[in-house]
Regions:
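Surface-exposed, low-complexity/disordered segments
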Residues: 95-222, 233-236, 285-286, 290-404
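Hydrophobic beta-strand segments
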Residues: 42-46, 70, 108
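Extended beta-strand-rich segments in extracellular/periplasmic secretory proteins, especially
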Residues: 210-261, 265-273, 307, 313
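Short, acidic Ser/Thr/Gly-rich low-complexity loop/linker segments typical of extracellular
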Residues: 49-58
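Structural motif
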Residues: 24-40
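Short Pro-Gly-centered beta-turn/loop motif in secreted/extracellular proteins
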Residues: 37-39, 60-67
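A short, solvent-exposed loop/turn motif at the edges and junctions
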Residues: 46, 72-82
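Short strand-edge motifs at loop-to-beta-strand transitions and within beta-strands
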Residues: 59, 90-92
Length: 404
């Protein structure tokens, strides 16, 4: 995490998508638990493309392939294959059942967590891609002042990744299409920059960028413990919890690592930065702020997902959430801000050439907001897969559009 990507905190709203045909077929719906609660971040796959459900549990999947079924999965639930009729037009309501833990699975609680993680690290070259690949993605940044959205930026992004056993880091990201929207009110904007941006899947790909977490020295700073196993899709997962065991010059994390029981591939990480030392947390989170503004970190949480497909485990989704307070000196009250960045991989292709070169590449010092245009076209994402905006975000976009 020492590498940093700057993203202006005032932007918010980015979507990731994959290029489809001129008139893509689409299916939409909402994913629920068996108890009727909406499931956020559920994975929906079909026709060679993938999307995730938004904060309302809603999704729209577009593809130019013949779509006869979709597969829906979520951590802790059994995956469900939903058959589609040729004339499927109405939104689906998909209910997932909680995965049951069998008796023999409880025995994994006695396993050695540190040895398990070490074994998973040793299998990275085998479990992950051994050839260069081009990923098609949708990226979204949002920023909120208190409970109100003040910025949205989103775009279609291509991401080139070399093989996971490749020694040089030549991974790159390029923006193919994007848009932005910023509150015109003077009091809404604050030029604070925090770590983030479209290169998050490169910098936070913990399986490939092992220097910030998955190495023997760094893991030595943590207590590792086995937790109750769970499932992702229909695959059983070991769950390893981690917490700091000593004070270090840099902040550490609390969190969980999910490891596939069959392949020993890392499939998911849920991490939260230790906020006990506010100065260290600030140094990790903050890139730039105006003189006289006091920055007070509250939360930095990360979610990193990988998906097994055709025998290869690939990165599939990344989300970061920042919460912090800012105030000017001599002012009585601080203002709460929330910034969220998320990127979903909607498709990928094998490639023998480097498709992103030179000026196309998004630099870690760039701000995504400065690279895209303002919201204008009402059907901007017509042919792309994206993370559908929630109802509250849609209302915020409409409100900000009226103020322009």
């Amino acid at each position: 995490m020492e590498r940093r990507i700057t993203t202006i905190i005032l932007l918010v709203l980015l979507g990731i998508t994959t290029v489809c045909a001129q008139q893509p077929k689409q299916v939409s719906g909402t994913v629920y638990s068996a108890a009727g609660h909406v499931l956020v971040g559920a994975s929906v796959t079909g026709g060679g493309h993938t999307v995730v459900t938004n904060g309302d549990g809603y999704f729209v999947l577009k593809t130019d392939a013949e779509l006869t079924s979709i597969t829906v999965s979520h951590v802790g639930y059994r995956a469900q294959r939903v058959k589609l009729s040729p004339a499927q037009n109405e939104p689906l309501r998909v209910y997932l059942k909680t995965a049951t833990i069998q008796l023999q699975e409880v025995l994994v609680m006695s396993a050695n967590a540190r040895e398990l993680v070490a074994a998973a690290i040793s299998k990275i070259p085998k479990n992950y891609s051994q050839q260069p690949e081009l990923f098609h993605c949708f990226y979204r940044e949002t920023a909120q002042k208190r409970n109100h959205y003040i910025m949205v930026a989103e775009g279609v992004v291509d991401m080139y990744k070399t093989a996971y056993d490749y020694q040089r880091n030549d991974d790159r990201v390029a923006i193919r299409k994007g848009r932005r929207l910023l509150s015109p009110r003077k009091g809404d904007t604050l030029s604070v920059k925090v770590t983030g941006g479209p290169v998050l899947p490169i910098q936070l790909d913990m399986v490939k960028q092992r220097d910030w977490l998955l190495n023997e020295e760094e893991l030595g700073y943590y207590h590792l413990e086995m937790e109750m196993p769970t499932t992702i899709g229909d695959r059983q997962q070991y769950v390893v919890s981690m917490r700091p065991r000593r004070k270090m010059p840099h902040p550490l994390y609390f969190g969980r690592l999910y490891i596939d029981q069959e392949t020993l591939a890392f499939t998911r990480a849920e991490l939260s930065l230790d906020m006990s030392d506010r100065l260290k947390a600030t140094q990790m989170m903050l890139v730039k702020k105006p003189l006289g503004v006091r920055f007070r970190p509250k939360e930095l949480s990360l979610q990193i997902d990988y998906r097994l497909e055709d025998g290869v485990t690939r990165i599939s989704y990344i989300r970061t959430l920042f919460r912090f307070n800012c105030d000017w000196r001599r002012r009585l009250f601080a203002t709460a801000f929330t910034a969220c960045c998320e990127m979903v991989v909607t498709g990928q292709d094998a490639t023998t050439e480097r498709p992103i070169r030179g000026r196309e590449s998004f630099d870690q010092r760039d701000a995504f907001f400065d690279k895209v245009d303002y919201f204008l076209d009402p059907v901007f994402w017509q042919e792309y897969n994206i993370i559908e905006p929630t109802e509250s975000l849609n209302r915020a976009i409409a409100r900000l559009m009226k103020r322009r």
